[in-house]
Design a protein with these regions (language model features):
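Phosphate/nucleotide-binding beta-alpha loop and adjacent structural elements of enzyme active sites
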Residues: 1-238
Length: 238
């Protein structure tokens, strides 16, 4: 019997993204493995991939045996490419419906308004605007094993103080790329998010970074001078 082909390969469709974008994705997934620090997707995990793009992380989650994966992506073109890249999870798999359960959701999570021409290169946006708790309620996802976030500034609204109790008790692990300059007012938004969300979780010793010095740097008044424009934050509850 033929073995199951791996979904995360160098033959994935890239949806005509620029060479710089593909190089960044390749480096973050294959080289630095940014989303694998401190926790990797385990068999039977429930995975929520916010900012799924062309499906690289979701493909990795599927290859690792995730029980269910939700791909949330505001760009229809990228989401359709992600579905294509994950087609192997369904085609010629008689157990796909029972075992795989990959769901593609055309939505912008954490955003109150969307200008796709600036953010995703698309002139119009016809998907949903969705909060984390709206997603949890609508799709009946009471617990999340791995919450991956790459949302270009919307991470502050996803990991919002109003969601803190859910994040602390119902999400096992969060791997989030934080952007300091992805939107106007980003500095003040980060400071508020740092004080209302990150600090309480840091006090519980649940926050991790790729660089241990960031624990101190994020709390400094001159954090913009000390931190890169984007960096990874991990919240590990158990």
């Amino acid at each position: 019997m033929f073995s199951k082909p791996k979904s995360l390969t160098f033959e994935m469709d890239t949806a005509n993204l620029s060479i710089n974008e593909i190089a960044h994705l390749h480096h973050s997934i294959f080289v630095s493995k940014d989303y694998d620090w401190w926790y990797e997707v385990l068999p039977e995990d429930i995975v929520v991939d916010v900012g799924a793009g062309i499906g690289m992380f979701s493909a990795k989650a599927y290859d690792n045996g995730a029980k269910r994966t939700y791909m949330i992506e505001p760009s229809r073109k990228l989401l359709e490419t992600a579905v294509k890249n994950l087609a192997g999870a369904y085609i010629d798999r008689p157990d796909a419906y029972e075992r795989c359960r990959i769901k593609a959701i055309h939505a912008a999570m954490g955003r109150t308004d969307v200008d796709c021409s600036n953010v995703w290169g698309e002139p119009q946006y016809d998907g949903k605007l969705m909060s984390l708790m709206e997603f949890v309620d609508y799709y009946d996802v009471p617990n999340i094993s791995f919450l991956k976030i790459s949302a270009c500034g919307a991470e502050y609204n996803i990991l919002h103080e109003d969601n803190l109790n859910f994040i602390a008790t119902n999400v096992r692990h969060t791997a989030c790329r934080v952007y300091l300059n992805a939107q106007y007012g980003g500095v003040e938004k980060f400071k508020h998010w740092r004080d209302s969300v990150l600090k309480p979780m840091m006090d519980l010793n649940r926050v991790y970074f790729q660089d241990d010095t960031y624990h101190e740097k994020v709390m400094q008044d001159n954090f913009m001078e000390l931190l890169p424009a984007s960096f990874m934050v991990y919240i590990k509850n158990w």
